[in-house]
C-alpha cells in the first residue's frame, strides 16, 4: 500500500518539476548606452558614444559598437565586450577605423587607418586602451604607415 501511495505521489509531483524546467520565452538582447572620455594617441582628447548589446542572460557580454569624435580625429569601432564583477571592470576587443585630422599625435594628418584595439576597464569604467592600426588611405612620405594607439579612458 505504501508503495502505491508513493508512486501516485511521485506521478503527481514529477510533472510539476518538469514544468519548472521548461524553456521559457527567449529574451531579446538587452541594449544599453555606452559613453566615455578618452585621452591619448593619436586623437588627444575624445568623446565616445555607442551601444552595448548584451547577448547572454547569464553573463554580461556581447557586441559593442562605438563612434568617437576627438580633437584630432574620429573613430568607428565594433567588437566583443565582457564585463567582469560588479564594479565596472571588464574588457573589449574591437575592429576600428580611424580618420585623423590636422595635427594628430604620432600619426599622419588627414589619413585613414584600420586595425584592432583592446580596451581594459580596471574598476568603475576607468582603464586603458591599446591598439595597432595600419594606414589604408593614400601613401604619403612619412614614417606613419603603422600606428600604435594608446590612451586612458573613463566610461559609463
Where are these regions (language model features)?
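Cleavable N-terminal export/targeting peptides
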Residues: 1-26
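N-terminal targeting leaders of membrane proteins
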Residues: 17-40, 53
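Predominantly the C-terminal beta-signal and adjacent terminal strand-loop region
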Residues: 22-29, 115-156
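Residues that define the transmembrane beta-barrel architecture of outer-membrane proteins
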Residues: 27-31, 41-47, 71-76, 89, ...
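Polar/charged side chains located within well-ordered beta-strands of beta-rich proteins
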Residues: 31, 59-63, 74, 80-82, ...
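Transmembrane beta-strands of outer-membrane beta-barrel pores
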Residues: 37-43, 51-55, 67-73, 82-84, ...
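Repeated loop/turn-to-beta-strand initiation elements of outer-membrane beta-barrel proteins
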Residues: 54-63, 85-93, 122-130
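Outer membrane beta-barrel transmembrane domains
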Residues: 64-69, 81-83, 89-117
Amino acid at each position: 500500500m505504501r508503495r502505491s501511495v508513493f508512486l501516485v505521489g511521485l506521478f503527481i509531483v514529477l510533472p510539476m518539476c518538469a514544468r519548472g524546467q521548461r524553456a521559457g520565452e527567449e529574451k531579446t538582447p538587452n541594449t544599453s548606452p555606452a559613453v566615455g572620455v578618452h585621452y591619448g594617441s593619436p586623437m588627444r582628447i575624445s568623446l565616445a558614444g555607442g551601444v552595448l548589446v548584451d547577448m547572454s542572460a547569464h553573463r554580461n557580454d556581447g557586441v559593442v559598437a562605438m563612434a568617437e569624435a576627438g580633437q584630432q580625429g574620429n573613430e568607428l569601432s565594433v567588437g566583443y565586450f565582457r564585463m567582469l564583477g560588479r564594479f565596472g571592470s571588464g574588457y573589449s576587443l574591437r575592429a576600428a577605423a580611424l580618420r585623423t585630422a590636422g595635427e594628430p599625435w604620432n600619426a599622419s594628418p588627414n589619413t585613414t587607418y584600420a586595425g584592432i584595439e583592446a580596451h581594459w576597464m580596471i574598476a568603475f569604467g576607468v582603464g586603458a586602451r591599446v591598439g595597432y592600426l595600419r594606414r589604408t588611405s593614400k601613401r604619403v612620405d612619412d614614417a606613419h604607415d603603422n600606428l600604435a594607439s594608446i590612451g586612458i579612458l573613463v566610461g559609463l
